[in-house]
């Protein structure tokens, strides 16, 4: 007679590798912050001497502003993730600082799309005169981009209004009410969609630009063509930085969001998605170091031209 009984082993609580989340990632953000502040400071000082006489310049200046504001949120994340700040700082990061980070990241992404559209018109269809190429139109469009991103993001601040249950283990989603969790999920889908739409536009527009430059180069070797090629080479470097920095994060973002808002994910899956999201988000943050290099290079060419 078999008297043995089987019992399921108790579920192990989810644990995080504190070496990764509290030491390595904060340290890397420190490096990105210091480098970004220096490079954006130099870039801003150089670039804002360039008159806002072209749509392209206006869009680049907005990217400089967005990168600078995004960089200002890094110290809060470093102190929060490393456990050096009080629990109130963690709440501030979840409610405010992280939202500001994402607003400025997607503002930058939107302006990358507008830059590609502007370059397409200037290089591929130079004889077409359109209102979209006017400076005033570009300024209005810039304001609309900022307003749209704020309208999508600010509810994440307002709806993150629940009291803290455990100051030793504060979870972002626990601070949101029911509507806040739904808005968080929906707004993330919208933001990710914005990225992939911009990515598609960049691909289409720059393929057309490459074809135009190649055909022009075959027909003529005049200086104007050389100038166009040099200008476009600078833009391609910006696009390369865009893809390298932002694409990995937006591949990882949707699975991570689903793991936050849906209950059927295992502990191991949640942790894997968390680490993937954090490292790819760090890569996106590193864009604040790459943009100033490309932008300053372009500004110096404008001064010489």
From Swiss-Prot:
Note whether Membrane occurs among the keywords.
yes
The entry lists its GO molecular-function terms as: G protein-coupled purinergic nucleotide receptor activity
Q: Name one GO biological process term.
A: G protein-coupled receptor signaling pathway
What topology does the record note for this protein and the membrane? Answer: Multi-pass membrane protein
Instruction: Using the UniProt record, give the first listed, main subcellular location.
Output: membrane
> Which residues lie toward the Cytoplasmic compartment?
51-55, 118-139, 210-234, 300-305
- UniProt entry keywords in alphabetical sequence: Cell membrane, G-protein coupled receptor, Glycoprotein, Membrane, Receptor, Transducer, Transmembrane, Transmembrane helix
User: One of this protein's Pfam families, by short name?
Assistant: 7tm_1
Q: Where in the cell is it found?
A: Cell membrane
Q: Which InterPro entries match?
A: GPCR_Rhodpsn, GPCR_Rhodpsn_7TM, P2Y14_rcpt
Residues listed as glycosylation sites in the UniProt record: 3, 161
One GO CC term, this protein: plasma membrane
Transmembrane stretches, by residue range? 30-50, 56-76, 97-117, 140-160, 189-209, 235-255, 279-299
- Extracellular-side stretches of the chain, per the record, are 1-29, 77-96, 161-188, 256-278
Entry's family note: Belongs to the G-protein coupled receptor 1 family.
What is the protein's known function?
Receptor for UDP-glucose coupled to G-proteins.
Q: What is this protein called?
A: P2Y purinoceptor 14
Gene name, Swiss-Prot/TrEMBL: P2ry14
